């Protein structure tokens, strides 16, 4: 049976994720006028585009809300963001720039905590402002039902009665004015913005057109690094990590992780760090475009991955990137608390993040222009003496050892040569690649794998004996 209601549940409590903007203000007043009992829940997620969030519940009461609550989600959101950081749970990247999934992170925390708050008030119907074309409608649906399996969904924007009466911003404004209800109609912009403590998303309207660049965006978490008139001074910053968690910035520890993230945002924001322009695939596989800000996450991520590369081996790093990307997509789809995500999170945090302890010093300039000045830690796999070109005592291996290692490679090189000869016979190579690979005559593989003919040495006798009587 569908959990989605398409008409107003008259006489019942309906919880609304309330931002205080025009859309949700009208929704609350309209539901009250038409016989429902609206209850509003506002998430404090540290959003940088809201300067007076404490006043929002009071505004909701003016529109007829029976219950109006402010739910502090900041600590939970920071913790989930730090988990995503340690897992590298970011799948959207373009030209070396990363989108740090700040909106999906916010939705996971907001939906879960708001529905739990509604459940405590015995509010079992929930609505929000997401549209049917976007990602959020599915994210909120999934997280809402995980938090309250009895939850039903009512969205005024899916109700033909509401849309027919109040289909646009002009109609909404006039409707409130006719009833002498106050409202806060934000200035019309060339794009829409959604923000939380980890980042800001700018999308829609003019940004839907790919001939419009990042320069039309007015950053809310930092400076427009592309504007030459904005002075940006060079700054050195040291990030400290313990077991995959950032613990200090420039040697300063903070009373809470929330305070640390605020400081990271301030440092990164001063340089315009962490802004990116991305084309992505929505959950429904339609492509969309967004401009993103995440100065603090970008700053921490640079240092974190520097330490990951200094500490872990190649296969571990490959797994970190592969599984992190998969986890990022799952989060994007609203599956951050699904079993497959929990499995990946547990593995990445336990076996990758827990080993990441150290400090990285960066020199920040403008935008993504930075230098790494120093990298230190107690358990690096990076040991310069192992590969030093200078003469070293007690070296891990010597010239003769490398000759033996190269000889062992003859087996797979011979196999590759045999495949190339076969491909040449099939006409798959040696045509477009003729200048590079030349002609491939048969017999090359055998020549590579052959040991040649020479008098048997002691080593040869041992090898023959092992093959005759030993095991592999």
Swiss-Prot record:
Residues 453-472 are annotated as: Disordered. Its EC number is 6.3.4.5. The keyword Ligase applies. SUPFAM superfamilies: Adenine nucleotide alpha hydrolases-like, Argininosuccinate synthetase, C-terminal domain. CDD domains: ASS. It comes from the Bacteria. ATP binds at residues 17-25, 43, 129, 131, 136, 194. Disulfide bonds: none annotated. Homotetramer. Belongs to the argininosuccinate synthase family. Type 2 subfamily. This is Argininosuccinate synthase. The gene is argG.
């Amino acid at each position: 049976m569908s959990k989605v209601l398409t008409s107003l549940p008259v006489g019942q409590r309906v919880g609304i994720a309330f931002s205080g903007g025009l859309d949700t203000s009208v929704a609350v007043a309209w539901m009250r006028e038409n016989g429902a009992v609206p209850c509003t829940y506002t998430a404090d997620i540290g959003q940088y585009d809201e300067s007076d969030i404490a006043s929002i519940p009071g505004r909701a009461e003016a529109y007829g809300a029976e219950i109006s609550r402010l739910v502090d989600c900041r600590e939970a959101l920071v913790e989930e963001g730090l988990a995503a950081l340690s897992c590298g749970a970011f799948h959207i990247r373009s030209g070396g720039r990363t989108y740090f999934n700040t909106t999906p992170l916010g939705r996971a925390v907001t939906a879960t905590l708001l529905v739990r708050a509604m459940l405590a008030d015995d509010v079992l119907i929930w609505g929000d402002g997401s549209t049917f074309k976007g990602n959020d409608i599915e994210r909120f649906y999934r997280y809402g039902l995980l938090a309250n399996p009895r939850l039903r969904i009512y969205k005024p924007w899916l109700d033909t009665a509401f849309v027919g009466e109040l289909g646009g911003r002009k109609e909404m404004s006039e409707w409130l004015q006719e009833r002498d209800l106050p409202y806060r109609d934000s200035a019309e912009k060339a794009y829409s913005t959604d923000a939380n403590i980890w980042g800001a998303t700018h999308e829609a309207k003019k940004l839907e057109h790919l001939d419009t660049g990042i320069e039309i965006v007015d950053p809310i978490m930092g400076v427009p690094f592309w504007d030459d008139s904005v002075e940006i001074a060079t700054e050195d910053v040291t990030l400290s990590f313990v077991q995959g968690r950032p613990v200090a910035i420039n040697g300063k520890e903070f009373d809470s992780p929330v305070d640390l993230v605020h400081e990271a945002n301030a440092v990164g924001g001063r340089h315009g760090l962490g802004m990116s322009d991305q084309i992505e695939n929505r959950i429904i596989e339609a492509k969309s475009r967004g401009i993103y800000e995440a100065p603090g996450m970008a700053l921490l991520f640079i240092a974190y991955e520097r330490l990951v590369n200094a500490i872990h081996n190649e296969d571990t790093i490959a797994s970190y990137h592969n599984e992190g990307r998969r986890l990022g997509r799952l989060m994007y789809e609203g599956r951050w608390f699904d079993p497959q995500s929990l499995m990946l999170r547990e593995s990445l945090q336990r076996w990758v993040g827990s080993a990441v302890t150290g400090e990285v010093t960066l020199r920040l300039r403008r935008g993504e222009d930075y230098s790494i000045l120093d990298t230190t830690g107690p358990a690096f796999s990076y040991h310069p003496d192992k590969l030093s070109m200078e003469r070293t005592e007690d070296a891990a291996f010597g010239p003769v050892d490398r000759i033996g290692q190269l000889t062992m490679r003859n087996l797979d090189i011979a196999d590759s040569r045999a495949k190339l000869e076969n491909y040449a016979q099939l006409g798959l190579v040696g045509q477009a690649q003729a200048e590079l690979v030349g002609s491939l005559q048969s017999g090359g593989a055998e020549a590579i794998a052959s040991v040649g003919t020479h008098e048997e040495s002691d080593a040869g006798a041992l090898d023959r004996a092992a093959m005759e009587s030993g095991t592999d």
